[in-house]
């Protein structure tokens, strides 16, 4: 028996954002990105920790959403 056989991981499938949702999010972030992003990240400490761990583990330095880069980098470092 391998050590990893005792683990059971269940992941929910990701939810897609409609084009309207995506447009609204982009508009909101471009208008007041810094304050909104900070509020979202700090209001969800568990998700912030998961994101931080993921970025540390994967050493992912590139995001598709360029508007998020500065704030996420500031919060996570």
Swiss-Prot record:
Keyword Disulfide bond belongs to the record: yes
Origin: domain of life: Viruses
Conditions for induction: Expressed in the late phase of the viral replicative cycle.
Keyword Disulfide bond found: yes
Coiled coil ranges: none
Assigned protein family: Belongs to the orthopoxvirus OPG128 family.
Function: Late protein which probably participates in disulfide bond formation by functioning as a thiol-disulfide transfer protein between membrane-associated OPG072 and OPG08. The complete pathway for formation of disulfide bonds in intracellular virion membrane proteins sequentially involves oxidation of OPG072, OPG128 and OPG08.
Subunit-level organization: Interacts with sulfhydryl oxidase OPG072; this interaction involves formation of a transient disulfide-bonded intermediate, allowing disulfide bond transfer. Interacts with OPG088; this interaction involves formation of a transient disulfide-bonded intermediate, allowing disulfide bond transfer.
Protein name (record): Protein OPG128
Organism: Monkeypox virus
Taxon lineage: Viruses, Varidnaviria, Bamfordvirae, Nucleocytoviricota, Pokkesviricetes
Gene name of the encoded protein: OPG128
